[in-house]
């Protein structure tokens, strides 16, 4: 496949067409007149309704009612009708009065229709017509507060979606899993689609920290999650791990609106590693230490955590302007500035964003454009996170500073010759202050789409989108040569990057929608073509000491891959109660050889709206909607693997493989292992669901049960020595099975003028098992050790019939009288009289059995109190921090330094670390209150100026039996956690 088919010329042509249409249409529409419609919307009790959607029929132009139920909308001259809609109420379409500018409306409760529109792949669909497992969260239900990245908006809001933040740093990267992920070695990250442009799965950029955080959360209108094969198969080979569709805010058809919001916060540390306090440390050294170790005790009482952590300031400021620039040109322009200090000193990030959305339409909405431009600049300062380990384990009886200028004035472990001791812990404060690592990251995302409703073919719509996602990241690291942390290499002073990423997209599809009343049928057909091209480049750079001496090098890279796709979807509705969805996508990837390049990914789904049957009529006063769903589909996987794994590739040997010729070092090239038989990893899944709505749609309930089987896993497996240039090779090997249950319930419990109360809860159970890890089905599958390393040990394995990353440990034996673990004594599980690797056993996994979420909002007049909570039930974590700092041997690794001990030493009195003891495996179940917010809507404080304010606490509390810092980790092993802060913030918003 030619990776260069799509280039900027596609976008250039598309933008020229947009400009031509705009330019040609301006004269025709510039003279159009119109009028301003105003009014109030009330309910059956004649109370004002907040948030009623009002749309000019035949356009995407509209507005919503304010706190008093009032609205204002600029209506073009040729407009004939307005549509009023609200969840749980009948949608009303009313003719615009000719001789009046006022239109008041009374809404009526609707127990028959669920007309919400949900964004799906390559289009939209009525919620009542969905056959797949789809969940959507909008602006009003997003998590609030200091939100640095889009995924935080929906954490805990959607059943089956687990989001684990990488720690407390403002640049930390979240792990997102939908239904637990479907793979092992390949990517488990979901596909993210931003305004129709698929992002690179698991995308990253040098110096970028969290790549997704380069999108301003304040610009997001909704996030839709596609979970089952019926909804995801339209994305084919990138959909095995689910899809998240992000839609940004667009301009509305009302007066020009200006919105400004500022959030300012302070963040504090919550919990740090459970180490001995100074008094207990002194007592333990005096009790167990040698005379020399006792002599190393000082007279200070240094709390190293207080020295490295700080109260962190943050601010998030956003300004937007939206409305109608011209009668045919809705627009929204926004800018944002975000700054956040980390609670670890020297850690911070700044982000500046700009966003432009233009949505012009012409010829009575027959021709519509959507032009979006998003730009981001991020400036990051990365702290040396090794200071967290040092801050936990350094001797609390010594001072921070030495009193002289040696080694920057920091108190360090030095020998009799004044030389830093090899392997000794460097001063934690010195690590932070002497490590200067900064980065500059730029990102631009542009998209332009044209949507044409073909006038002479009823229901036919032609659509094309061009997208371009470009990013650049570079950074600089400086450490002075006197810094002990880099003493042996003479410090650091070098620049890396710039890495440049390119993502180009061309989408063309046709959609036909029509209702055939004579046969009680409706069809919606989409056929299309996609082409997407990615490129990543990084220049060669040298890693230098502070004096400019080369220490090592990093090779230049130029990576490219592309994906070509053809797809189609049929939605068929019969009698508004029997629903069919069939999808087919055929993908061709440049990551596979020609014989295996193309993959086909179909799906089919059926749904039955039982509540539309005549026999159900007596129940409709209570049960407003009942829908049964079933789907089956196949999705693919080719992300998370190398771009050229199927062809011979040579890699520079660089510093590790040089030869001397004529006294000069010559770099070598070595061949990489390759496999021309690589093919698609495929996932086959079934989904069974039910959707309910009752009591006039005030309560909704959904349940989904799914099974999933992933075959031909893309995995790196051992090879015989001397085979194919390497001992490891990427192959298609093994299967993984999973199943799960998801439950969601939402209730609009109270909705009156003075009071409203909404609540939602979700729960997800999942079970994942590895079924095979060999090329030959039925052959014995060897255990593969995986996960983080502690010293020379890994605690987790891939094993047949067990969950991925299951813990593989020795069974600790305990003293029957004291209940204390007996050092070095484990159960002889195979009964051979010896403790060997065969005595290790599979014991739990990091994955929780249940993931729960709950949120609620209570309003009294203009006051609103809201909160969100999350819980994990089951799942285990290996307390590596307790194990690795909880034995006497860790008290001192040399003759010049003492180290603090974890409080677990008081319970075990271990002399040696027990690396693989299940004593350190702890239940990681927890209950967290993520946020608690109190807000007040002042309404109009001066003519057209609206004011609202809120106060919030994030990371309010955690209830858990886990003894470490945080029970929530992405990999299940706690080696030294950057604690998540507790954040207090105040938000003030102005609208005019």
Model-predicted regions and their roles:
Residues 127-129, 202, 234-236, 254-255, ...:
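Switch/connector loops and helix/strand junctions flanking conserved nucleotide-binding motifs
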Residues 151, 155, 728-737, 777-807, ...:
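C-terminal extracellular loops and terminal segments
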Residues 1-363, 367-374, 445, 680, ...:
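Short, small/polar-rich motifs associated with maturation and membrane association
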Residues 142, 189, 312-315, 351-352, ...:
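Extracellular/periplasmic, surface-exposed regions of secreted and cell-surface proteins
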Residues 294-295, 305, 429, 589, ...:
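Extracytoplasmic gating/loop element in the C-terminal half of outer-membrane beta-barrel translocons
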Residues 846-877:
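Glycine-rich, aromatic-lined ligand/substrate-binding cores of catalytic
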Residues 259-299, 644, 748-846, 961:
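Conserved small-residue
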Residues 46, 69, 405-408, 418, ...:
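Detector for glycine-centered tight turns/loop "hinges" at secondary-structure junctions
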């Amino acid at each position: 496949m030619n990776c260069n088919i799509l280039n900027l010329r596609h976008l250039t042509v598309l933008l020229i067409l947009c400009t031509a249409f705009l330019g040609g249409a301006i004269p025709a529409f510039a003279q159009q007149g119109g009028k301003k419609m105003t009014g109030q919307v009330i309910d059956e009790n004649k109370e004002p309704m907040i948030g009623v959607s009002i749309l000019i029929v035949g356009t995407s132009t509209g507005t919503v009612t304010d706190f008093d139920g009032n609205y204002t909308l600029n209506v073009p001259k040729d407009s004939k009708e307005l549509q009023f809609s609200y969840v749980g109420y009948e949608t009303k379409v009313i003719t615009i009065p000719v001789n009046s500018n006022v239109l008041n409306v009374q809404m009526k409760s609707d127990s028959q229709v669920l007309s919400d529109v949900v964004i799906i792949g390559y289009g939209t669909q009525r919620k009542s017509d969905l056959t797949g497992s789809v969940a959507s969260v909008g602006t009003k239900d997003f998590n609030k507060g200091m939100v640095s990245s889009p995924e935080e908006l929906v954490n805990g809001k959607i059943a089956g979606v687990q989001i684990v933040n990488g720690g407390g740093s403002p640049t930390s990267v979240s792990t997102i899993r939908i239904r637990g992920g479907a793979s092992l070695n390949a990517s488990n990250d979901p596909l993210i689609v931003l305004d129709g442009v698929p992002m690179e799965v698991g995308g990253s950029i040098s110096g970028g920290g969290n790549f997704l955080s380069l999108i301003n959360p304040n610009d997001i209108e909704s996030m839709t999650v596609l979970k089952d094969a019926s909804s995801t198969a339209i994305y084919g080979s990138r959909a095995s791990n689910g899809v998240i569709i992000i839609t940004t805010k667009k301009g509305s058809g009302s007066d020009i609106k200006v919105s400004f919001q500022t959030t300012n916060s302070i963040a504090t540390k919550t919990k740090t590693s459970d180490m001995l306090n100074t008094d207990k440390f002194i007592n333990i050294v005096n009790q167990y230490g040698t005379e020399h170790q006792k002599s190393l005790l000082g007279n200070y009482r240094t709390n190293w955590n207080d020295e490295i952590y700080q109260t962190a300031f943050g601010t998030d400021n956003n300004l937007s302007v939206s409305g109608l620039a011209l009668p045919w040109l809705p627009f929204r322009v926004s800018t944002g500035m975000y700054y956040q200090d980390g609670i670890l000193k020297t850690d911070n990030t700044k982000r500046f964003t700009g966003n432009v959305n233009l949505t012009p339409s012409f010829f009575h909405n027959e021709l519509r454009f959507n032009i979006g431009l998003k730009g981001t600049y991020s400036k990051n300062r990365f702290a040396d996170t090794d200071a967290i380990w040092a801050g936990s384990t350094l001797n609390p009886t010594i001072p921070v500073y030495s009193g002289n200028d040696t080694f920057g004035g920091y108190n360090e472990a030095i020998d009799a010759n004044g030389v830093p001791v090899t392997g000794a812990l460097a001063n934690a404060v010195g690590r932070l202050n002497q490590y200067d690592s900064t980065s500059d990251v730029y990102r631009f995302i542009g998209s332009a789409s044209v949507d044409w409703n073909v006038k002479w073919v009823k229901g036919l719509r032609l659509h094309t989108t061009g997208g371009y996602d470009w990013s650049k990241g570079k950074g600089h690291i400086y450490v002075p040569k006197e810094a002990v942390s880099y003493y042996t290499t003479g410090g650091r002073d070098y620049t890396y990057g710039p890495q440049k990423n390119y993502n180009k997209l061309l989408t063309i599809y046709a959609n036909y929608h029509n209702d055939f009343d004579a046969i009680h049928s409706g069809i919606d057909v989409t056929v299309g073509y996609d082409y997407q091209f990615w490129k990543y480049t990084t220049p060669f750079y040298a890693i230098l000491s502070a004096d400019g001496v080369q220490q090592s090098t990093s090779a230049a890279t130029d990576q490219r891959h592309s994906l070509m796709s053809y797809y189609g979807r049929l939605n068929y509705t019969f009698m508004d109660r029997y629903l069919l969805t069939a999808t087919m996508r055929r993908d061709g990837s440049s990551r596979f050889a020609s014989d295996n390049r193309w993959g086909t990914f179909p799906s089919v789904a059926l749904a039955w709206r039982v509540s539309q049957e005549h026999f159900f009529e007596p129940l409709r006063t209570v049960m407003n909607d009942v829908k049964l769903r079933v789907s089956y589909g196949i999705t693919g996987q080719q992300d998370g693997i190398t771009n050229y794994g199927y062809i011979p590739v040579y890699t520079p040997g660089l510093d590790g493989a040089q030869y001397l010729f004529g006294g000069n070092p010559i770099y070598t090239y070595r061949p990489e292992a390759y496999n021309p038989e690589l093919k698609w990893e495929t996932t086959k899944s079934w989904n069974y669901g039910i959707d309910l709505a009752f009591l006039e749609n005030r309560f909704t309930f959904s349940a989904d049960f799914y099974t999933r089987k992933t075959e031909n896993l893309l995995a790196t497996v051992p090879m015989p020595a001397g085979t194919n240039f390497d001992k490891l090779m990427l192959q298609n090997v093994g299967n993984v099975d999973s199943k799960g249950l998801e439950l969601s319930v939402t209730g609009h419990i109270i909705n009156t003028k003075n009071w409203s109360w909404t609540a939602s809860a979700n729960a997800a159970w999942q079970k994942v098992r590895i079924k095979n890890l060999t090329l030959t089905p039925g052959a014995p599958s060897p255990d593969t050790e995986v996960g983080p390393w502690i010293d020379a040990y890994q605690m987790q394995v891939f094993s047949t019939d067990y969950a991925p990353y299951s813990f593989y440990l020795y069974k600790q034996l305990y003293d029957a009288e004291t209940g204390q673990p007996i050092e070095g004594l484990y159960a002889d599980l195979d009964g051979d009289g010896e403790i060997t690797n065969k005595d290790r056993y599979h014991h739990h996994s990091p994955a929780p059995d249940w993931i729960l979420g709950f949120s609620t909002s209570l309003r009294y007049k203009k006051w609103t109190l809201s909160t969100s909570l999350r819980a994990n039930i089951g799942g285990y974590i290996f307390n590596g921090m307790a194990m690795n700092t909880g034995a006497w041997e860790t008290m001192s690794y040399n003759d010049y330094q003492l180290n603090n001990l974890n409080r677990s030493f008081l319970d075990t009195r271990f002399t040696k670390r027990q690396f693989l003891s299940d004593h350190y495996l702890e239940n990681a179940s927890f209950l967290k209150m993520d946020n608690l917010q109190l807000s007040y809507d002042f309404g109009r404080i001066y003519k057209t100026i609206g004011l609202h304010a809120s106060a919030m606490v994030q990371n309010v509390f955690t209830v858990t039996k886990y003894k470490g810092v945080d029970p929530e980790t992405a990999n299940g092993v706690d080696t030294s956690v950057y604690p998540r802060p507790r954040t207090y913030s105040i938000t003030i918003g102005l609208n005019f």
